[in-house]
Amino acid sequence: PALGSAIAPEDPFFTIVTYRGAFGNTNNWLNDWTALSDNNFLGDLVDPLTTADCTNPIRITDADLVAGETYTWTKDNCYVLDGLVFLEEGATLNIEAGTTIKGAFEVTTGDNTSALIVARGAQIFANGTADEPIIFTAELDDPTDPDDVPNPQEARGLWGGLIILGDATIARPGGEDGIEGIDADEPRARFGGTNDDDDSGVLRYVSIRHGGSALAPGDEINGLTLGGVGSG
């Protein structure tokens, strides 16, 4: 079904497929007869998704990313975020197309969920492609199997998500605030400032799945959270 893990109707009019939405990645029924096809609005077909083996992933904790350093995560590895992992001021994270990053199912750091937080002054460059998207998902998820988390109610909130914080103007007294879902005393979780041209990096062909941890009533981490991100 188009919305993902919904239960398929029993009506024989419908055909069960292995992809989400109206179009598969091996054929497109709009090709060669529609105006969209004639005017080259249809993208190229892509190969079936393949991901790195996550049997022995690289486990990333907050201590592994240091301010001012540059890091590169590659598609031949699988990365698991254990707890709240901050990319600190002055640090850069490059993520290769086709890379899979997962939020830990069992957090060992004492945090109540897993998330990647790009702090003010840090940059993330996640340049995926149509053939090789960058996938952020839960540790329990196999991105190549659309049916491994069959219950829609169980498919959300399996980890925190991706949080990007910038230095642009926000509508808060004093010009800054702390992002929801993280301890108010954590200085790296502050966002907002005076630089509307602030540049936090690039997200391109990035898929974020099964995120959105509910920490308490009215307090959660969304799959993707942007706070004070500038136009740079």
Give each language-model segment a name.
Residues P1-G232:
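Beta-strand/loop edge motif enriched in small/polar residues
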